[in-house]
Each structure stands twice: as C-alpha cells, then as structure tokens.
C-alpha cells in the first residue's frame, strides 16, 4: 500500500477538522517508514544506511493542573530514524490539542503520557522534553559553512534530479547550506519551506550543481522526513562521500515544525538550534 493511499484513507489532512474535547491517543496516525524507503531502493529488511532522528518542536501545547489552571509549554519530541514508523503531522497536532482540557498532577505526568503514546506508535523510545520558561529557549543560529544561495545560477528543473549532482577529484571536508528548500505536502499540496545543511568529507561537490539539486525539489510532493532521506541517499550514491550528514529545519505549520537529521555517524548528538526562519 502506498503512502498516499494510507493517508487518503486514514489521515485528517485535507479534511474538515473536529478538534477533540478530551484526551485522544487514538488520533495518532503512524506511517511505516518502509513505504518511502522502498522508493529509494533501500533494503528495508536491514537497518537503514544512516543514523539520526526527527526532531519536532510543538509551540501550541497546554494542559490543566489538578485545580483546573492551564499550563503552557513548548514541546520537543525526538523520534529515532531507526523507528519503524513516523507520525503524520496533522494527527500529531490533533493529539496534542486533546490535552487542552485534561488535568495532570504536573508537567512530568504530561510528558510521560506523551512519551508512552508516541513510543507505542513508532515502536521505539521517543524522547519528550518540555521548555517551560523563556530562559530555556535556544537562540537562533546560522550554520558554520558556505551559503549556496549567493550563487548566480539558471535552472528550469523542479522535480528531484540526482543527475544534477557532480564532484571533482579534490577531497574536502565542508559544510554547505541553503534557505531555498521547498517541497510540498503529498496530500494537500501545501508548500513546506525549510533550510538545509549538508556536512561531508569526500570528493568536492560542485556548489552550483548542489544548489540546483536543492531547488529541484520545489514542486516535489513528499513528507519532510522522506525528502531528507532522499537528499541523503542521492548524495551518498552520486557523490560517494566518506562521511555525510544532512539536516533540514522546516518552518512551522499548525504549531509544529519538523527537523529531520540523517548521518553516517552513529555517535551524533541531538542539537535543537532554531534557524532564523523558525
């Protein structure tokens, strides 16, 4: 069954929404990662050829204490890339809203409930953190590397084309980034805007051609997580780096932003540095 068929049958995307009045964990819609990975010719009977996570920031998160007083927080959810499933975004939004009128002893009880529900849906332990005070908010940052967007290029390709990628014989270690990433929701067609950062060691990637490749996603319809895995696999196969990390930070929609990270490095650390567009 294709990802699109699963979504059309089960997702609330593109449908009139009735917001839940009470706690509703059944709203969470898990989608098998294998559905997309098969289209990338990834052997789904083996562990994926990368490590990483999907980091979600939730900006519209609230619940009641036992006296009925509302509390609010920013939520941080880290789903391992090795999990069998991802969570469809609108179902996640509705699930979070189902906490609005529920009473809990404290924030820890809320986060533990969410951790249990999410981990059950994706078949792996999900990390849940709450940011409760302004002093805990990470500052915006700019990647330490070369901005590709300043390059003067001509392009008329707006669907992913890995043949745009090219390398030289020189071996380098460098970080490249762009704020021109745009793809689209495969169900609603809504645009997904983001910034992408690529760090690698290997044959030097032609910067202009890489920018063209990034822009080629402009009319592509695929989820955030799937786009980043396509980026990773295309660069890995066509440019043959010894080390590769690809991460994207998407702007928020419906109170959520999604930030997938994929790497050849198994010892990565989770970083939640918000881009200036977030």
UniProtKB/Swiss-Prot annotation:
InterPro entries: GTP-CH-I_C/QueF, NADPH_dep_7-cyano-7-deazaG_red, QueF, QueF_N, QueF_type2. Pfam families: QueF, QueF_N. It catalyses: 7-aminomethyl-7-carbaguanine + 2 NADP(+) = 7-cyano-7-deazaguanine + 2 NADPH + 3 H(+). Keywords: Cytoplasm, NADP, Oxidoreductase, Queuosine biosynthesis. Residues 255-278 are annotated as: Disordered. GO terms for molecular function: preQ1 synthase activity. The active site is at 185 (thioimide intermediate), 192 (proton donor). It is found in: Cytoplasm. One of its GO terms (cellular component) is cytoplasm. Coiled coil: none annotated. Belongs to the GTP cyclohydrolase I family. QueF type 2 subfamily. Catalyzes the NADPH-dependent reduction of 7-cyano-7-deazaguanine (preQ0) to 7-aminomethyl-7-deazaguanine (preQ1). NCBIfam families: QueF. This is NADPH-dependent 7-cyano-7-deazaguanine reductase. It comes from Coxiella burnetii (strain Dugway 5J108-111). The gene is queF.
């Amino acid at each position: 069954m294709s990802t699109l068929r699963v979504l059309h049958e089960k997702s609330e995307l593109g449908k009139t929404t009735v917001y839940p009045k009470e706690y509703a964990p059944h709203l969470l819609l898990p989608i098998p990662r294998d559905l997309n990975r098969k289209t990338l010719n990834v052997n789904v009977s083996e562990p994926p050829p990368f490590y990483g996570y999907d980091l979600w920031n939730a900006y519209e998160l609230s619940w009641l204490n036992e006296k009925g007083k509302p509390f609010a927080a920013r939520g941080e959810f880290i789903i391992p890339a090795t999990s069998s499933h991802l969570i469809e975004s609108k179902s996640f939004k509705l699930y979070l809203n189902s906490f609005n009128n529920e009473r809990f002893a404290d924030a820890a009880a809320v986060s533990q409930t969410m951790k249990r529900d999410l981990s059950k849906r994706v078949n792996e332990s999900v990390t849940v953190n709450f940011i409760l005070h302004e002093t805990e908010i990470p500052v915006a940052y700019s990647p330490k590397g070369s901005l590709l967007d300043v390059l003067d290029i001509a392009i008329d390709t707006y669907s992913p084309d890995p043949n745009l990628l090219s390398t030289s014989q020189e071996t380098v270690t460098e970080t490249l980034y762009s704020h021109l990433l745009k793809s689209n929701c495969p169900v609603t067609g809504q645009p997904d805007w983001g910034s992408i950062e690529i760090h690698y060691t290997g044959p030097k990637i032609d910067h202009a051609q890489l920018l063209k490749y990034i822009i080629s996603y402009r009319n592509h319809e695929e989820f955030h997580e799937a786009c980043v895995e396509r980026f990773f696999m295309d660069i890995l196969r066509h440019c043959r780096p010894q080390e590769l990390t690809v991460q994207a930070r998407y702007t928020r929609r419906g109170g959520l932003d999604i930030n997938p990270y994929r790497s050849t490095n198994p010892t990565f650390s989770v970083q939640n540095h918000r881009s200036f567009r977030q």
